[in-house]
Curated annotation (Swiss-Prot):
PROSITE patterns: RHODANESE_3 (PS50206). This is tRNA 2-selenouridine synthase. Belongs to the SelU family. It comes from Shigella sonnei (strain Ss046). Involved in the post-transcriptional modification of the uridine at the wobble position (U34) of tRNA(Lys), tRNA(Glu) and tRNA(Gln). Catalyzes the conversion of 2-thiouridine (S2U-RNA) to 2-selenouridine (Se2U-RNA). Acts in a two-step process involving geranylation of 2-thiouridine (S2U) to S-geranyl-2-thiouridine (geS2U) and subsequent selenation of the latter derivative to 2-selenouridine (Se2U) in the tRNA chain. Its EC number is 2.9.1.3. The keyword Transferase applies. CDD domains: RHOD_YbbB. The lineage of its organism: Bacteria, Pseudomonadati, Pseudomonadota, Gammaproteobacteria, Enterobacterales. Residues 14-137 form the Rhodanese domain.
Length: 364
């Protein structure tokens, strides 16, 4: 039976997006997994818990016997069919369990007996996780340029267009503000960190990377937080600030938060439920900053939001949203960002409109 692995191999697996057949229980997979992993467990959560209890009370031999008893007959055959199909679909893939121990070896031996010679990750998920953490620590040491600017400045798009850019918000599946959620649920913290490590490794491998281009983010992006090693480096980084006209920012925000989000919700849920989800999304975003706005101002903006939604529903026009978006930017988001930027003014090395900043970044 094949085996792979040195420290460099773990990184190579992440860079290549090697399919990983992860045989850990679903609860383990949800807590943290590699980006290209699919979960086809040897034992489900209940079976794993029962075997774990048996191990503590009666030892490893009894636990192993119980595991074979629980995963037998039709259950074993169903799981074998799933593993066989996954192996045939992903001939360059690899098996993985928690530490490269019994679970992946058992599945590997069963597959081998069925005529499929399939490798496994020595050290399992734990080894891959440590490789991901170490890669982030090392790669974060390269110089960083941050793209700053008020809400609607097109910072994320600018980062996405750079060969040395890493879209932190895209990886976190959140745009970082009260209105930042997307239709994709956020990953667990460990899975987010693994995805970030893989993206940094792939970006670094594609070129002779001298510096990173990242968006000027706070520590938290929705429910995910940036790894401390990267966050610390970002606090020391140079900042290029996008200063686009207010009207252009409004156009971007209209496209991103009204037109696109409405489209995405209706595409996912259908017209009627999609509309309700879209309305709830906007109200939830405004409600999240109610305390900072003050109750009176919040109620005024919420009423304007309701009016704008009625107009959008009846006319398809999103223009009515300007009635609450403009004051929200001028009274809340813009002053907040300018205050934050003032605290790190000495880090600002360039200011300009979007195209000017994009051109400047290329020269770095």
């Amino acid at each position: 039976m094949q085996e792979r692995h040195t420290e460099q191999d773990y990184r190579a697996l992440l860079i290549a997006d090697t399919p990983i057949i992860d045989v850990r229980a679903p609860i383990e997979f949800e807590q943290g997994a590699m980006p290209a992993a699919i979960n086809l467990p040897l034992m489900n959560n209940d079976e794993r818990a029962a075997v774990g209890t048996c191990y503590k009370q009666q030892g490893s031999d009894a636990a192993l016997a119980l595991g074979h008893k629980l995963v037998a007959g039709e259950i074993r055959q169903q799981r074998m069919d799933a593993w066989r199909a996954a192996c045939l679909q992903n001939p360059q893939g690899i098996l993985c369990c928690a530490r490269g121990g019994q679970r992946s070896h058992i599945v590997q031996s069963w597959l081998y007996a069925a005529g499929i010679d399939y490798p496994l990750v020595e050290g399992g998920y734990k080894a891959l996780r440590q490789a991901a953490i170490q890669a982030t620590i090392e790669l974060a040491q390269k110089p960083i340029v941050l793209i700053g600017g008020c809400t609607g400045s097109g910072k994320t798009l600018l980062v996405q267009q750079q060969p040395n850019g890493v879209d932190l918000e895209g990886l976190a599946r959140h745009r970082g503000s009260a209105f930042g959620r997307t239709l994709q649920p956020q990953l667990s913290q460990a899975s987010f960190e693994n995805l970030l490590a893989a993206e940094m490794l792939k970006t670094d491998a594609r070129q002779d990377l001298r510096l990173w281009v990242l968006e000027d983010e706070s520590r938290m992006i929705g429910s995910n937080h940036l790894p401390e090693c990267l966050r610390e480096r970002m606090t020391q980084a140079a900042i290029a600030v996008v200063e686009d006209p207010f009207e252009i920012r409004l156009e971007r925000l209209n496209e991103e938060y009204f037109l696109r989000m409405h489209h995405d919700f209706t595409h996912a849920y259908g017209d009627e439920q999609g509309w309700q989800e879209y309305c709830e999304y906007l109200h939830h975003g405004l409600s999240a900053i109610k305390r900072r706005l003050g109750l009176q101002r919040y109620n005024e903006l919420a009423a304007q939001l309701d009016t704008a939604l009625t107009t959008q529903l009846t006319t398809d026009s999103t223009d009515g949203h300007l009635a609450w978006l403009v004051p929200l930017l001028k009274e809340y988001y813009d002053p907040m960002y300018r205050y934050q930027l003032e605290k790190k003014a000495e880090k600002v090395v360039f200011r300009g409109e979007w195209a000017e900043v994009a051109e400047w970044v290329k020269t770095q």
